[in-house]
Structures are given as C-alpha cells and as structure tokens.
Amino acid sequence: MASVIALSLLLPAAFAADHSPLRARLQDGLARTPQMGWNTYNHYNCYPDEEIFRSNAKALVDFGLADLGYRYATIDCGWTLTERLANGSLTWNATRFPSGFPAIADYLHDLGLLFGVYGDAGIKLCGPSDEHEEQDAQTFAAWGADSLKYDNCFSEASLGYPNVEYAPSSPLKPRYEVMSNALQKLDRPILFQICEWGIDFPALWAPALGHSWRIGNDIIPAWRSVFRTLNQAVPQTDFAGPGQWPDLDMLMVGNGVYSVPEEETHFSLWAILKSPLIIGSALKDATTEINSESLRILKQKAVIGYNQDKLGVSASLRRRWTDQGYEVWSGPLSNGRTVAAVINWRGEARDLTLDLPDIGLQSAGLVKNIWAGSTSRNVQTSYTARVEGHGTMLLELRDTVPAGVYPKKIFGSSRGQGTVFKSVYAGSTSENYTLAINFAKTIPSASKITVQVGANRQKLSIAVPPSRQQVTATIPLVAGSNNTITISHSHPITAIQVTSPNGTYYPATQFSLTGAARHETCGEGFCQPVGSKVSYLSPNSTARGVIPASAGTKYVEIDYINNEVAFSSSWGWGANSRNLTISLNGGEPVRLEVPLSGRHSELFGPGKGWWDTATLGVSVDGWKEGDNEVVVGNVNGEKGFQPYAADFVGLRVFD
C-alpha cells in the first residue's frame, strides 16, 4: 500500500481522542540514551557475592564492553541483611561482601564503571525501603551509587505482603513517587530504574519519576518469552525518548538458553526498541566465561549504535504474518536512516522478503544486512535474504525514497519516446490507484500522453492541460511488487507517484453476531473510531458482514482491542496476545495473532485498557466481484490457550 502502509503501521486508534496525559520526564541529564551495563540477577539470582561481582565488572573492561557503553554494574537482590542497623540504615551482608559497598563503588569508579544498587518498595527480603525512602536514598548516595533498580516485592499490605501481587488494591505511582522525590533531593545524580513488572501501565506515569520502567514480567530462560515481551512492548513504543526508556528486561544473551540466531533476534529487538541493554549472563567468574558467539553479539557495534542513536525513537511493529510465521519492525534513525527487523518465528531457515512500502519506503540506495554481514545497493521495492530459524534479518537502510514515489533515475528506463517504470507496488488488487506524473518542467501547451499498466492492459490516454507540471489519472494495479507502468510522452518525466485507494471502513456495528458475541458501548472518546466494539468472539461466536468489492487480493486494516496482559501466566503459556480470524466467502481463515493494544491501567484505567484500539493490517485473498461474506472470529481457538478472540471494532478494505 504505497501511501497507506506508511500511515497504518500498528497505531493506537485513540488517535482521534488521546486520553493519555502529557508525559513529563526528569530533567537531570541522565539516560539521554538507554542505559547499558551488567546485572547479577539473571545468572546468579539472589546469591551474588563480592568475588563474582568484581570479576564480572572487570570483564566489562577486559572484554571491551565498557568501551562500547556497558558501564552500569549492578548488584541485584541478595546483598542486604534481613535487619537494619540501630540507626535504621540498610547495610550489606558482610559475609558476601566483606569489603563493603563504598569500597566496591570505588573499585568500579577506578575502572571507569558506574555502581548500580538494588532496592525495593516493599517491607522485606529484597532490600526494602518502605517508609525509609529518604534515608535509603542518602545511604545509596553516600556509598557512591550511580543507579538504583527499584523492585516491588512484598508491598501489598491488604493481602499480608505476598512476594508478588499482580492486582494491588491501589495505584503504584505514589509508592514510586516517594523514592523518586528522595533521589531528586540528593546532590548526587542517581539513575532511577522503576521495576514493578508492568503492573498498572507504568508508561503513563513512570517517565515523570524515573529514567526507565519495566514493561512486563521477568524474561525467562525460554524462547517464547521473547514473543511475549514484544507483544507487551507494542503499545508502549511511542513513550520512549531521551530520559525515559521502556525496559524489556535484562538480556539472556550468553546464558546458554537461546541458540545463536535466537540471541541475535533477542539483542536486535531489545536494541531497536530502545530498551536498556543490561547483560544478564556470567561474563567471567571462577568457573564460567561467556562464549565467543554471545560476546560477538553483545559487541555488535551497529546494533549498539541503533540503541544509542541520538534521535531516540523506538522501532514499532509494522506488519505481522501469523500463518506464515514472520513479522516486521522498523523505526527511524538519525541522518535520515531507517532500521528494520524481519523476525523468522519458524524453526527452520528460509528466504524472507521485506517489501519496503511496509516500512514506509520505496527504495534504498544502500541496505546493510547486519547479521549476514552483507551490503546491497540500489534496492527497489523489496529485499530478500536468507534468515535462520528463529533468527532476524536486521537491516539498516540509507538514501531512501518514501513509499509511493518512483524517481525515473531509480525505477525508470527509456524506451523510444516512452518510459517504463518497474517494481511498482500495490497492497491490493484494485482499479482505484491514483497515478501522478511529474514533468521536468511546465508543459507550455496542451498535449496527450498514454499510460499502460502491465503488458496486456488497454492503454489509457491522458490529456495534459497547458501550464501544468503534473497530471494525474486513475489506474489499476495488482497486489504485489512487480507491476509495470509504461508511459508514452514527449516531455521529460522526473518521477511518478502512486497513491493507494482510501478504502472503505466497515464498523463492527454493521456486522451481525452469532453465539455469545455481543456489541458493547465504550466510554466517550474510546473504542475509536466507532465508540463500540464486539466482544466474546470465539470459535462458536462470530461477527458476519457483507462487503462489496472487486475480485483479487485486498489489504485489510483491522481495528482491534486486546488487553489480556500476561502476568502470572507469563511463566507458562502467556503471550500477551489474542487471535482474530477473517474468513472470506467460506474459504480458509486468515489468522492474525494481535499484540496488546491497551494504553491505560489494566486495574484502574478507563475500561481497564479494554477500550483502547490499535490497528494492524493483513492481506486477504479470495475476494470476488460483488458482495462478499466476511466472518470475523477465532477459528480453531479451542485448540490453544486463546478461546476468545481480540475484541473487534471495525475494518477497512482497500479496494
């Protein structure tokens, strides 16, 4: 969709009435790019000691990681005594850390590193600061701390302080506000990392209090947690910016649980989504040293550069092909560059193609394939490469042209008095594309040109009025990236532009329902753009509509709602996703596993996040001339963990 795809990426459809407040950020100069470093937890859990910590910190320097930006070295849980000192101060476990924290801070600072400490908003075990925030902040500063990771264990009084509570009785912002205020009173700047596992949608309030916030539950030593984490990141990518970074959790690279391609995918996506890059493996201790392949991944300068890019804009999800097992993310970089990632969710290696219009581009003068180590020049419309099972095609694109624009010098070739433009892209098969032809200079007198799309189409004669430098016409195109447009002309052409049809929107209110599916009215300004939705779609409950169209493949944008956040389920099957299927004229359904859309608290926000719409596009084949029966549901949902589909707001068919 030349001009449409650049706009329909995966956007929260609260676009008409954004109920999110302005997100203030700390103005202390810290974390202008995402923080990088190393943390004890993923490998050593709550059992770190001084020897382990010093050895790994030294490895940051010895392995060249510190020079690349990995400078925060953090001791996570397990460093405190169970009781405070007589004056109320926290102290370290002298058995595990005999030199003491001030000496450890000095050691790190002498290495050119920064000292990270760990605390907790609760009452016990993790280094609790509840009702001791100012005292603890002053203590951390006196020890020479440079950052504080602040957890939320044992904090829910109404339930007797369980270790973890995913549905607290009150909002979490006030609890973190106390420590944030205490840190801001210090003379020493301390990076504040909010870690309450994504509960209460911290993206709305954490940027005003800290420099990063955990978007979800812990990453686990299982490949499926990467998909789960990315699905939770989708509605939060636009919250990222200098001084405020969504934290996808510490890296598993080097822990021996992911394959090399999986580690490359994990590292690539954490980097381009602007997550803090915190190593969670053993770099070097008395018995363990990180393997060379994982170290190579952690030291990949281009990928680190995308994470630390001065523009500070996160990549976002652009397209997902659930049935085919791959998806595309992309985002802008400084100096007009673009980064794109094509993830292969299947377990086998295969060739995958990136259609550049899916990321808002039509061509690139230079494409770097980072993990393949290759470079291509003058790439037009699409790029194909081999991708390992569970691997990622990570690309940097330079010298790009926006989607829908076809300069003659790139796409055109002369043929007599004509010009042939190749590799013209169309998201849908449609008769309603708009072609704009740009001439090198103003046409002095009336003339005519002819346009032919493909080899077998009838030629179209277009009158060119005098004193014009551009003329437009409506043309047919076939879905795909191999359309050709031949223009016979007597005046020089510089470029053509192709704009997709606007499409027709069909709100869910126009669909009839079966089974338990029901229409629900949402709060004012929500469930955009309709104001209502269909919920409880399942294998036996559907929404059915009749949509007129021409024959062929169509690009369809679906407005959906999903806020089934995986908290306790994240340790097992939870994926932060729900399915939607579209069946056309009784044919095989197209399945789309949609990520979260909620942009408000799942506990206290309007509609508990179930009124926040997002949009995702899918190609649907099998349209016929005339009326088409469209069924939205969750075919085969009974076979998995998702019996209910995402809620359905409406869809737009581009024809």
From Swiss-Prot:
Its EC number is 3.2.1.22. Substrate binds at E196, W197, G198, I199, D200. It comes from Aspergillus terreus (strain NIH 2624 / FGSC A1156). Glycans are attached at N87, N93, N432, N482, N502, N540, N579. The active site is at D151, D218. This is Probable alpha-galactosidase D. GO terms for cellular component: extracellular region. SUPFAM superfamilies: (Trans)glycosidases, Glycosyl hydrolase domain. GO terms for biological process: polysaccharide catabolic process. It catalyses: Hydrolysis of terminal, non-reducing alpha-D-galactose residues in alpha-D-galactosides, including galactose oligosaccharides, galactomannans and galactolipids. Hydrolyzes a variety of simple alpha-D-galactoside as well as more complex molecules such as oligosaccharides and polysaccharides. Gene3D superfamilies: Aldolase class I, Galactose-binding domain-like, Golgi alpha-mannosidase II. It is an enzyme of class 3 (hydrolase). Keywords: Carbohydrate metabolism, Disulfide bond, Glycoprotein, Glycosidase, Hydrolase, Polysaccharide degradation, Secreted, Signal. PANTHER family: ALPHA-GALACTOSIDASE MEL1, ALPHA-GALACTOSIDASE/ALPHA-N-ACETYLGALACTOSAMINIDASE. It holds the Pfam family Melibiase_2. The gene is aglD. It comes from the Eukaryota. InterPro entries: Aldolase_TIM, Glyco_hydro_27, Glyco_hydro_b, Glycoside_hydrolase_SF, Melibiase_C. Disulfide bonds join C126-C153. Belongs to the glycosyl hydrolase 27 family. It is found in: Secreted.
